[in-house]
């Protein structure tokens, strides 16, 4: 399995960048609304704290994580939102401190996961490297919500490659959660990275293909921007359909933006 080290390093850097955005905000700004309906900046950080806690539980306490799965199944529509709302009520200073401590513990635990161990999650079980990538994706996406709320445009980084990779790998999942049969044939996905280099997945002679900006593809698969506003294009009926349902995150179909 892949060494989790580089992925954890990217996750740490992404988390630190978001931390820097909110660390010096006046307490009242944590109540600013974000593009996610009903969610403030405090909700966004609270959600990341909660999911980092849950990921830490998945690594360190398999029985405890199984209990969380049972609770989630009992309240599938409100489980995530309820947790974010509860944590958003905590003072910003306490919330930020708790997130810093929790994510730091998670990063260290991911580095210590034995090679070959699969970690339980709300989607398929995954390696420590994949867990770090999933946390990177979510931290980037919710960080984007915070940046949008603050009117900040964040520079694209090479860390987007792992998020794009996750978006490609979850192609079939996006079809399945939308009650559609995944395409039998592979797609070519060819994206332009922030430095102008090309990132590609799939056979070069594939009939169905997706091309465009890597950053915009990441906006798409995290459902942070509407497809009509993005430099992402598809050739082929199945590839075109995928762009309308793509999601790199676990759970039911997202509502998009």
From Swiss-Prot:
Pfam families to which the protein is assigned, alphabetical: MDMPI_N, Wyosine_form
Cellular component, GO annotation: peptidoglycan-based cell wall; plasma membrane
Which SUPFAM superfamilies would you find in this protein's record?
Answer: DinB/YfiT-like putative metalloenzymes
Q: Which GO terms describe its molecular function?
A: metal ion binding
InterPro entries membership: CHP03084, DinB/YfiT-like, Maleyloyr_isom, MDMPI_metal-binding, tRNA_wybutosine-synth
Top-rank taxon, per record:
Bacteria
Q: Which NCBIfam families match?
A: maleylpyruvate isomerase family mycothiol-dependent enzyme, TIGR03084 family metal-binding protein
Protein name per UniProt = Uncharacterized protein Rv0036c
Q: Which organism is it from?
A: Mycobacterium tuberculosis (strain ATCC 25618 / H37Rv)
């Amino acid at each position: 399995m892949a060494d989790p080290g580089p992925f954890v390093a990217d996750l740490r850097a992404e988390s630190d960048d978001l931390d820097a955005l909110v660390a010096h905000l006046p307490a009242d700004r944590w109540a600013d609304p974000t593009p996610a309906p009903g969610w403030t900046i405090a909700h966004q950080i609270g959600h990341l704290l909660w999911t980092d806690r849950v990921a830490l539980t998945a690594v360190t306490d398999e029985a405890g994580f199984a209990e969380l799965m049972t609770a989630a199944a009992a309240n599938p529509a409100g489980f995530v939102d309820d947790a974010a709302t509860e944590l958003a009520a905590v003072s910003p200073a306490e919330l930020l401190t708790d997130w810093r401590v929790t994510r730091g513990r998670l990063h260290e635990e991911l580095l210590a996961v034995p090679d070959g161990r699969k970690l339980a999650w709300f989607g398929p079980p995954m390696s420590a490297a994949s867990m770090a990538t999933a946390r990177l994706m979510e931290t980037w996406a919710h960080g984007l919500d915070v940046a949008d709320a603050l009117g900040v445009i964040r520079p694209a980084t090479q860390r987007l490659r792992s998020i794009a990779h996750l978006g490609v790998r979850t192609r079939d999942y996006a079809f399945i959660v939308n009650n559609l049969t995944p395409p039998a044939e592979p797609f070519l996905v060819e994206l332009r990275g922030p430095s102008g280099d090309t990132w590609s997945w799939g056979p070069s002679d594939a009939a169905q293909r997706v091309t465009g900006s890597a950053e915009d593809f990441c906006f798409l698969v995290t459902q942070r921007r509407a497809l009509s506003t993005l430099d992402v294009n598809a050739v082929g009926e199945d590839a075109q359909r995928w762009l309308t349902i793509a999601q790199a995150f676990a759970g039911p179909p997202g509502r998009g933006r």
